[in-house]
UniProtKB/Swiss-Prot annotation:
Active site: S101
Protein name as annotated: Phosphoglucosamine mutase
Species name: Streptococcus pneumoniae serotype 2 (strain D39 / NCTC 7466)
Keyword Repeat: no
GO cellular component, one term: cytosol
Annotated function: Catalyzes the conversion of glucosamine-6-phosphate to glucosamine-1-phosphate.
Amino acid sequence: MGKYFGTDGVRGEANLELTPELAFKLGRFGGYVLSQHETEAPKVFVGRDTRISGEMLESALVAGLLSVGIHVYKLGVLATPAVAYLVETEGASAGVMISASHNPALDNGIKFFGGDGFKLDDEKEAEIEALLDAEEDTLPRPSAEGLGILVDYPEGLRKYEGYLVSTGTPLDGMKVALDTANGAASTSARQIFADLGAQLTVIGETPDGLNINLNVGSTHPEALQEVVKESGSAIGLAFDGDSDRLIAVDENGDIVDGDKIMYIIGKYLSKKGQLAQNTIVTTVMSNLGFHKALNREGINKAVTAVGDRYVVEEMRKSGYNLGGEQSGHVILMDYNTTGDGQLSAVQLTKIMKETGKSLSELAAEVTIYPQKLVNIRVENVMKEKAMEVPAIKAIIEKMEEEMAGNGRILVRPSGTEPLLRVMAEAPTTEEVDYYVDTITDVVRAEIGID
């Protein structure tokens, strides 16, 4: 990670850390880096989620892009993966999404996609950071006909919706409950599933700029669980603020997380001979039960660090077409270049329809070990150095010895927030509580700032 770019673009509290001034510079410098080898006038797509700060940052970012002669196509409110899809399929030089994903409304972020639809590599981010840190802005300042042109492009959203519908199968009145997190999916999910013929119940569809991810969406699926049971829906589908994640709910109101979603899709593709190298790419956060289910099914796995960018890197390097995270990022490389919650939802309902099985039946093949994750607020500088603290290192080693191989512990820094994450898995909830609570007590005493 660099000075400005984290694991998922530039993020911070809007107007305090991620300021309009910084957004202008990111537009100007990022646009220049991503388009300097273009022979024709470069075109960049810009999208945003529903945060109150989105239009402020969008205006500043767009001004920066226009100032270096880039034509900007403004997409409005739509999902992050829609930006990636449109960049790749419509020949744009780059795409930019203004969103802080699952974070609360006070935060926002800016992430770039290259002309291939993939998030930027470390080298491109380093080029942009070097320009941000330069003492003087020496980039070209064209005037008159050299300036970029701003185009409103709402049809981009319709194209994305149509594409997702084309990957699915008619649902013939299947009862589906949606939770669009008062976020980006609020402009598209209802239309997509209506076009597929589903009978819909929708919550989290009234964004006001402040309620994105607030007690709704993939990080707060409790409301959707109740709606599924009350409405008699066959499935509930919860997206996060920018709709790059999906958490599902089965007909009984039980959670089906990213691990189970990956398993269901992976098994389906494997049976059809369509799972590249019969392998799923996952991260160190995936549950032991997920790994055991893959072993029983004879499906291989490749394991990466936490973060969908690392999953995508491994998929591109080795030619895999399915990967993801327990949190609900699922990358279906045959369809898009990044995690796409609505695409995953369309594929999940297609599998239910084609197999004739309920979601609970499909998910039952993965027995999830009890898992507990606790986030501890620490100074940003300390989250990377936690494992160097002797007391923290010692307590983790002690807990791992007690587990004797029947469970696991993972302590890692958040890529986007000043948090240290402590996770444990074990056969019983009592054991999990003991391991996590023991470790977090030591971490808080040593470096916590709560």
